[in-house]
């Protein structure tokens, strides 16, 4: 457990290397979890369906390639998001160390910097997140071109269509990354300190290795309701409603019209019950735990390779 931790407070890390390593880790994570991401989004935006029904419907209507629906904007989003997240984490950390004398613990430092990095990466990659959501929500088997979807959003909603729900997303992602980096570094620091005081290293070595999955599980579970609401907001004004599984949910989506984030959340609870905020949470955890672990692990791997 004596390897360099590139996310630790006071570590001197190249912002350029962090940007490159973050982009590569984002692409690597996306490649591994794309099918799970598609199913998770389907569950979030389609009321009343169950996991098994979604899986069967995708296979029947779209075939196996349906699980990679929106993979191009999804991959671009993960590359931009990963690069912006880790690159801004390093840059913001360097700025705070140089311009401010923050007398805070490494754990709190990770929460603060992680939150700012999360909001930065969310804003930078958000248009592709909107595209990814609309591609994944599409229930028809025919191939949709990225250019056509971009032009449809531009024609019907204008520039702001690519940033639908962006404000709430930045809060959601900021909170998510604050928890993720905070828990990750807390576990790393705890295990390193305990291993120095104990002759039995194995339990702490295992916990150290599980820092990524645990941080992913904790952050996703804590912020999932916010993520579900923002997914609904992202497709409520979609110019291609007929593509989505919304034949029996049009009245539900009409009730979201002109409502802000909190209003949509309240409407979901009133019409579908409190558990609607956690629709797809099982699939999300199955996706997010390995995704976060892969992202953090591969980031450290690429950083070590880049020197």
UniProtKB/Swiss-Prot annotation:
Keywords associated with the record: Membrane, Mitochondrion, Mitochondrion inner membrane, Repeat, Transmembrane, Transmembrane helix, Transport
Transmembrane intervals: 19-36, 76-96, 108-126, 160-184, 210-226, 280-297
One Gene Ontology molecular-function label: thiamine pyrophosphate transmembrane transporter activity
Location within or outside the cell: Mitochondrion inner membrane
Swiss-Prot/TrEMBL GO biological process terms: mitochondrial thiamine pyrophosphate transmembrane transport
InterPro entries in UniProt: Mit_carrier, Mitochondrial_sb/sol_carrier, Mt_carrier_dom_sf
Cellular component annotations (GO), alphabetically ordered: mitochondrial inner membrane
Membrane topology: Multi-pass membrane protein
Pfam families: Mito_carr
Swiss-Prot/TrEMBL Solcar repeat ranges: 13-95, 105-190, 203-305
Chief place of localization: mitochondrion
Domain of life of the source: Eukaryota
Disulfide partners: none
Biological role stated in the UniProt entry: Mitochondrial transporter that mediates uptake of thiamine pyrophosphate (ThPP) into mitochondria.
PANTHER family with a match to the protein in the record: SOLUTE CARRIER FAMILY 25
Family recorded in the similarity comment: Belongs to the mitochondrial carrier (TC 2.A.29) family.
Protein name listed in UniProt: Mitochondrial thiamine pyrophosphate carrier 1
Species per Swiss-Prot/TrEMBL record: Candida glabrata (strain ATCC 2001 / BCRC 20586 / JCM 3761 / NBRC 0622 / NRRL Y-65 / CBS 138)
Gene: TPC1
């Amino acid at each position: 457990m004596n390897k360099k931790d590139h996310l630790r407070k006071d570590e001197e890390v190249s912002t350029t290397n962090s940007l490159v390593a973050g982009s590569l880790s984002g692409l690597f994570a996306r490649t591994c979890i794309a099918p799970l991401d598609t199913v998770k989004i389907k569950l979030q935006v389609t009321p009343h369906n169950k996991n098994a029904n979604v899986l069967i419907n995708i296979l029947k209507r779209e075939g196996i390639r349906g699980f990679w629906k929106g993979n191009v904007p999804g991959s671009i989003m993960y590359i931009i998001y990963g690069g912006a997240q880790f690159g801004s984490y390093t840059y913001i950390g360097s700025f705070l160390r140089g311009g401010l004398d923050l007398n805070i613990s490494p754990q709190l430092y990770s929460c603060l910097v992680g939150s700012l990095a999360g909001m930065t990466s969310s804003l930078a990659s958000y248009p592709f997140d909107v595209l990814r959501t609309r591609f994944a929500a599409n229930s028809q088997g025919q191939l949709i071109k990225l250019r056509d979807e971009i032009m449809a959003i531009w024609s019907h909603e204008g520039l702001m269509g690519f940033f639908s729900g962006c404000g709430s997303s930045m809060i959601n992602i900021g909170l998510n990354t604050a928890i993720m980096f905070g828990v990750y570094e807390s576990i790393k620091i705890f295990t390193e300190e305990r291993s120095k005081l104990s002759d039995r290293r194995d339990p702490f070595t295992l916990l150290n290795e599980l820092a990524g999955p645990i941080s992913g599980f904790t952050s996703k579970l804590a912020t999932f309701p916010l993520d579900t609401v923002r997914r609904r907001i992202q497709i409520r004004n979609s110019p291609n409603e007929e593509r989505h599984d919304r034949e029996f949910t049009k009245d539900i989506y009409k009730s979201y019209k002109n409502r802000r984030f909190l209003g949509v959340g309240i409407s979901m609870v009133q019409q579908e019950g409190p558990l609607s905020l956690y629709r797809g949470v099982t699939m999300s955890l199955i996706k997010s735990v390995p995704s976060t672990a892969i992202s953090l692990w591969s980031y450290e791997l690429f950083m070590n390779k880049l020197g």
